[in-house]
Amino acid sequence: MIHAGNAITVQMLSDGIAEFRFDLQGESVNKFNRATIEDFQAAIEAVKNHPEVKGLIVTSAKSTFIVGADITEFGQNFAQGEKAIVEWALPVHDIFNSFEDLDIPKVAAINGMALGGGFEMCLVCDYRVMSDQAQVGLPEIKLGIFPGFGGTVRLSRLIGIDNAVEWIAMAAPKKPAAALKDGAVDAVVSADKLQEAAIDLVKQALAGRVDWKAKRQEKLNPVKLNPLEQMMAFNTAKGAVLAKANPAQYPAPKLMLDSLQAGASLGRDEALKVETEGFAKAAITPQAEALIGLFLNDQIIKKTSKKHEKGAHPVNQAAVLGAGIMGGGIAYQAASKGTPIIMKDIGNPQLALGMQEANGLLTKQVERKKLTPAKMGETLARIRPTLSYDEFKEVDIVIEAVTENPKIKEAVLADTEAKVRDNTIIASNTSTISITRLAKALKRPENFVGMHFFNPVHMMPLVEVIRGEQTSEEAVATTVVLAQKMGKTPIVVNDCPGFLVNRVLFPYFGAFDLLLKDGADFQQIDKVMEKFGWPMGPAYLMDVVGIDTGVHGAEVMAEGFPDRMKPDYKGSIQTMYEAKRLGQKNDVGFYKYELDKKGKKAKTVDSTAYEVIAPVVTSEKREFDAQEIIDRMMLALCNETVRCLEDNIVATPAEADMAMIMGIGFPPFRGGPCRYIDQTGVAEYVALCNKYAHLGKAYEAPQLLRDMAENNKKFYG
């Protein structure tokens, strides 16, 4: 044994070839943390001290190769400032360089996921052989940073500027065929032939059949383009990347491009210094803090959800009641992830609509070559449309998705309970009606739970799992595990009107309505909030949701929270509803809708909308300062999020923030309401609440925030 460390072992195989094996002890995956980097340095020194080593294959003992840097650990460095990040990163480059510079050929044998720093490790090797089951990539842009272990420098020299920019900016893992085509790997083989192929490539290098030194030299030299070619390549890349990523919202892509361009004409060592400086600039941005926070929050939620597996009972057969767009979407989602599902309704036209929804979604998958026609057939076969309860004795969980009307739901739920086994879980897809209230119609309320999908089901990642007063932990656990199996992110919340997401969303709509009353222009509000980072402004969002749906939800919320959600005036949303302007569903709302060339509804300005709401605008119309619009909209939303934490509706800031991002499109680069309050400064945020408190209770700072401000506390750290 040449080296035996906690993260790496090095041992001779044969013919002067040694195996440099990553196997981080006590972890299920390999990752670059401080311990791994220290061991990496020690292992390199050990190889240097063993002249009998003539070549290396780099392998992993795990099912993945290396999944990247330990962001939990390294993220702590980012709070230390730009200079400290550079001082931390440059010695890491020295270690990677010393491995690259070993005067022997090295081949990475990529058996599984090689992401971020893991793929940067592969790039340090002279050759890369990849299993046909593996994936490689540089996902750091999703975290508000970019590759910082030499990825921008080495990849651009290996595969060219245009390809490297696409790999880094898109941040998506690459399958073997794509990696081979672009030249990021040198061979793709079956998993069982991987080590043999890597050893064979080292032997070819040692025998002089491949020029490994010339191959390495490409990575040490400047990019092979003259200044004019470089300028053209970067201008094209900037146009493509910055059209998708506004630097004011997502600065990392532009910082990456600037670093790449500045380092392209330099040799490796100087280019790495440029990369490090750019990386440090990205790492200290509030966007990086927010996006890294989201990644960590996602890990927390996955761990929380995993804990439910022990308490769940298996779901071998599901059912959905109500076969409209929602029911069809739920059936599609379950069936496409392998769970057989019965879809019941009271009439054939409704069943046809549900099957049409599932069929349409699957057809699109086939057209995009993401699914074969045979797999589509298998998926459709898992959906059994029916008008009867005959097969419901087989069902482990029933998801009710009928009209959002308490009396109808209560009747359907009671009827269903009589047709299923005593241990069958019944879940309601209600968006606002109290689970505790609906449970009163049932004999076994402990088996009843909320399972709130968001529309469209196939696109929206969040499922709220709602615990009523009598809901058992088994019912919660079973529903959480099913949601995960369906490819969704479940967040468990306690029961209240609107649950978590809608309870928070309606004060946001209330703030919008109040701004209109005070003379703001809804188009200006939409533009300001979209520039702030929302995918659409509140007027457009209300049209998409449906103004009738919004009015109904507002009534439920006003009944539940009259002190801050029951307006003492008639607003524009109610007025639109009374004028039968329902939004996209009937083509007129705040905007007018017409089909574009692709057959999608496109919004246009409709002057009639202003005439409709004019009677309820009590102040003279004026142009508002953008920051006032932002403050009034965001305070109402963030305050209600904090109240949900105070009331134990949601357990943690991490879950609250993720729910808002996945459920209503809160700008990811701002990290969620709790992160937004932290980055504003809790004391400063409370002062803003005080400034706008005259607008009503929705603007009053919750006691939790006042206590946090007094004690200099934050939600994170």
UniProtKB/Swiss-Prot annotation:
Pfam families linked: 3HCDH (PF00725), 3HCDH_N (PF02737), ECH_1 (PF00378)
Annotated InterPro entries: 3-OHacyl-CoA_DH_CS, 3-OHacyl-CoA_DH_NAD-bd, 3HC_DH_C, 6-PGluconate_DH-like_C_sf, ClpP/crotonase-like_dom_sf, Enoyl-CoA_hyd/isom_CS, Enoyl-CoA_hydra/iso, FA_oxidation_alpha_subunit
Record region (Enoyl-CoA hydratase/isomerase): 1-190
MF GO annotations: 3-hydroxybutyryl-CoA epimerase activity; delta(3)-delta(2)-enoyl-CoA isomerase activity; enoyl-CoA hydratase activity; long-chain-3-hydroxyacyl-CoA dehydrogenase activity; NAD+ binding
Keyword Cytoplasm: no
Binding-site list for substrate: D298, N502
UniProt keyword Cytoplasm present: no
SUPFAM superfamilies registered for this protein in UniProt: 6-phosphogluconate dehydrogenase C-terminal domain-like, ClpP/crotonase, NAD(P)-binding Rossmann-fold domains
Residues annotated as the enzyme's active site: H452 (for 3-hydroxyacyl-coa dehydrogenase activity)
Coiled-coil intervals: none
Protein name per its UniProtKB record: Fatty acid oxidation complex subunit alpha
Gene symbol of the encoding locus: fadB
